[in-house]
Amino acid sequence: MSIVQPTCDSWAATLSAFLTQTQVDRTDFVSPESGKPAGSLTVTEGFTSSGAKVRIVDTRLFIADLGLDAAMIHAFAPSQSTSPHLLSDLATMQDPTDDGQRRTTWHFHVDLMPRVDLVTAPEFIDAVYPPITQAYNDAYAIADMLPIAVPHRLRSLASPWLVGAIVLPTDNVATSQAFTAYAKHWHELVNSPPLVSDPVIQRARDIAHRGAMFNDETDP
């Protein structure tokens, strides 16, 4: 029985509730070894209240025999805008304990991916990140939480507000609260982009940034 998928169902529902005129395309995965269902890829496109067209990419993997239970839920703002993308994932892991045993943990990430160079546009920092600072701090204050060793290349492409936490499955309420805070603020920023930018230049930057982010060298 999955412990990740129900939590991520609620995350996906939170994002879908922001949209109207949705179009949904779903592809189911099947294990080549067993022939059993192994997950799915669901792409949902729709419009926010401001008329911005966005895309939610929801990837699920669940193979009980292998102990694989994971989800990635990303919400992409218009490519030509400066509104951040929401990136999140949740997966179970079997981590070693001090007594030589293993325990089931959750590896949790959430971030609002910056859409400009934060060094040259600190006003983007001021416009985007203060409202999620409390959620960031709360995530790292979860009892017995351990920080994930995020690869340096990946961290450099993310924001300083990237949450990477190892928690227990019983911390599902706390992780969902962090996700919801980031998701609601993402929706606000899609409706009101933080900065004005040339749409052609912005789209080219976004393509390059996403190409670097979703790359095996960045996150092997």
Residue ranges of predicted features:
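Short, flexible coil/linker segments at or flanking structured domains
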Residues: 3-6, 96-100, 201-202
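Mixed-charge (acidic/basic) macromolecular-recognition segments
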Residues: 105-219
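Short Lys/Arg-enriched alpha/beta "domain-start" segment
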Residues: 1-85
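Residue-identity detector for threonine
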Residues: 7, 14, 20-22, 27, ...
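Extended, charge-biased low-complexity segments
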Residues: 52-141
